[in-house]
């Protein structure tokens, strides 16, 4: 019988010193993904702004106006509800360099009423109420150019989509280690180049390149750590690898507070990727990949190194390692296999919708917080903290209660929290923060559970394909989310939350249509996957009837 890596790790250590060392190193990689995934909150922060009008600054200085008086005297008031504010995107067509203006009410000297004064575009740029800078303030991504901020964030998600779709083949073809080192090098270079980009176009190009490699590198780190540990620890290290990403969120909030200028922030969060190049000497190639390439001797050498690091010794009977042979006819998976049969088709549609919804709500809530929050740094920090209890609740519930009910409940909590936030008055900001944190915790749980359940619902020969196809909807959601958030807030600040609420509640209801996978073996065939929903007693009754039918002709 073939000796597998899992068999050897039972003797050489499934999660001992070596695996803990690898987990720490790869967890650092996971943490540095946070600034790329949600850094738009700080990089693309849009402060209060108004049109710059030549002569206003000089008049304000001559008259000794306070900032509030300058706004009241020289800037149009807010527009009607549901319309973009003229204060931000329009200015009075007035020559403020005239010496006839009075300091008390300068516009009163004009013949026409203030409400009838002609308004024009911001030809001379904007004045931003912020001590720092962002890509919005530097490249004037406001008013007619505000869609360029949406495009900036969508570009990184386009990169995620392309990179994650191709990373499986690349990592299987060239190895995990080479692929990891290549992605971190490109990610580091693109991040630094983005920080010194002279124009919006160059910044957009480097952001797209970051998207192409950053999520791919994060996924390779996930693959590596799960391949280094024994089977009993894979789920746990997978969850804690995502917890490391949450630590990255907390660090990002602190760094962004210390560095309010986007170029320095981008440069600082990109530098650690150069450190990961040292992993060439720290992290070995995956033994499982080496075996798949028939490099058994090299795989055995690495496994002996793992055992030595763990203070273990391998029995002589386990000194030879062979790849398990697949029996039966080899099947070639295709997309049609995901929709050909009724139950698997239902699973595919629900999983795709849940991946999409998880991405939209997760990224959307963070982006909306950047627009609606009073203190962007504290709000971001508090909402990131709730991801820790989310991870521990998953660990406590999925093997006790199951996957389906916690998954459905987390989606519904996220959706209900979004809807509840809409109706909380602005003077109850503390309550709004608590409800928002509940929503963030709910969607974090949903996001992590869909990663787990996706693989458990598909038979072996289409499992990888099913995970890749369904999870690609996560990146599609990320592409759409910036346009959804930033465009809808121009209509009404709370409108995105209403959309998120409906999406989350529907996702929770659809999850209840899926079978429970707790305690069930992974399906090996289409038939097993199709029968997952059926109660066991019905299956036994069907088998009994079949036996009776077979007995009748023999009498």
UniProtKB/Swiss-Prot annotation:
Organism whose genome encodes this protein: Homo sapiens (Human)
Outcome when changing residue 544 to F: No change in TEA uptake
Mutagenesis or variant effect for residue 257 to F: No change in TEA uptake
Bilayer disposition of the protein: Multi-pass membrane protein
Annotated glycan sites: 72
Stretches in topological domain Extracellular: 44-150, 199-208, 260-263, 370-375, 436-441, 486-494
Stated name of the protein: Solute carrier family 22 member 2
UniProt keyword annotation of Ion transport present: yes
GO molecular function per UniProt: acetylcholine transmembrane transporter activity; amine transmembrane transporter activity; choline transmembrane transporter activity; efflux transmembrane transporter activity; L-amino acid transmembrane transporter activity; L-arginine transmembrane transporter activity; monoamine transmembrane transporter activity; neurotransmitter transmembrane transporter activity
Induction per the UniProt record: May be down-regulated in diabetic patients.
Main location: membrane
Outcome when changing residue 362 to F: Decreased TEA uptake and YES1-mediated tyrosine phosphorylation. Strong decrease in TEA uptake. Strong decrease in TEA uptake. Strong decrease in TEA and metformin uptake and YES1-mediated tyrosine phosphorylation
């Amino acid at each position: 019988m073939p000796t597998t890596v899992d068999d050897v790790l039972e003797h050489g250590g499934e999660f001992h010193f070596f695996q803990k060392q690898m987990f720490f190193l790869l967890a650092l990689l996971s943490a540095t993904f946070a600034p790329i995934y949600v850094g738009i909150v700080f990089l693309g922060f849009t402060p209060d702004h108004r049109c710059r009008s030549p002569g206003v600054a000089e008049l304000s200085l001559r008259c000794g106006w306070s900032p509030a008086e300058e706004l009241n005297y020289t800037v149009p008031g807010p527009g009607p509800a549901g319309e973009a504010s003229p204060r931000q995107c329009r200015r009075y067509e007035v020559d403020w360099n005239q010496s006839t203006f009075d300091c008390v009410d300068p516009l009163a000297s004009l013949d026409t009423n203030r409400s009838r004064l002609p308004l024009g575009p911001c030809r001379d740029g904007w004045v931003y109420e912020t001590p720092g800078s962002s890509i919005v303030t530097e490249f004037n991504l406001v008013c007619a150019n505000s869609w360029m901020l949406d495009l900036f964030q969508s570009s990184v998600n386009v990169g995620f989509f392309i990179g994650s779709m191709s990373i499986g083949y690349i990592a299987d073809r060239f190895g995990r280690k080479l692929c990891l080192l290549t992605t971190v090098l490109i990610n580091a270079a693109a991040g630094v180049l983005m920080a010194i980009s002279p124009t919006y176009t160059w910044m957009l190009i480097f952001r797209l390149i970051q998207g192409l490699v950053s999520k791919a590198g994060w996924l390779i780190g996930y693959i590596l750590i799960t391949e280094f540990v024994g089977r009993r620890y894979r789920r746990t290290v997978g969850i804690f690898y995502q917890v490391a990403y949450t630590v990255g969120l907390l660090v990002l909030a602190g760094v962004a507070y210390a560095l309010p200028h986007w170029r320095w922030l981008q440069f600082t969060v990109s530098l650690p990727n150069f450190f990961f190049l040292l992993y060439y000497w720290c992290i070995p190639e995956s033994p499982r990949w080496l075996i798949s390439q028939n490099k058994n001797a090299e795989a055995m050498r690495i496994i002996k190194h793992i055992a030595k690091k763990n203070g273990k010794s391998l029995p002589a009977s386990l000194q030879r390692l062979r790849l398990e042979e697949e029996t039966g006819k080899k099947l070639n998976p295709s997309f049609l296999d995901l929709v050909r049969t009724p139950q698997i088709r239902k699973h595919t549609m629900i999983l795709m919708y849940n991946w999409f919804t998880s991405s939209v709500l997760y990224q959307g809530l963070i982006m909306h917080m950047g627009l609606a929050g009073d203190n962007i740094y504290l709000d971001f920090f508090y909402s990131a903290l709730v991801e820790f209890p989310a991870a521990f609740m998953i660990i406590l519930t999925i093997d006790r209660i199951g996957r389906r009910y916690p998954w459905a409940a987390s989606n519904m909590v996220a959706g209900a929290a979004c809807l509840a936030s809409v109706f909380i008055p602005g003077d109850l900001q503390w309550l709004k923060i608590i409800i928002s944190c509940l929503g963030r915790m709910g969607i974090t749980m949903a996001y992590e559970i869909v990663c787990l359940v996706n693989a458990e619902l598909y038979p072996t020969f289409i499992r990888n394909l099913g995970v890749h196809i369904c999870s690609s909807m996560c990146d599609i959601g990320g592409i759409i989310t910036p346009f959804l958030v930033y465009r809808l807030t121009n209509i009404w600040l709370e409108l995105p939350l209403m959309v998120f609420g409906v999406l989350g509640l529907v996702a929770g209801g659809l999850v209840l249509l899926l079978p429970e996978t707790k305690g069930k073996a992974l399906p090996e065939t289409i038939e097993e996957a199709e029968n997952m929903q059926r109660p066991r007693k019905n299956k036994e009754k069907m088998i009994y009837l079949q036996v009776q039918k077979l007995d009748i002709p023999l009498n």
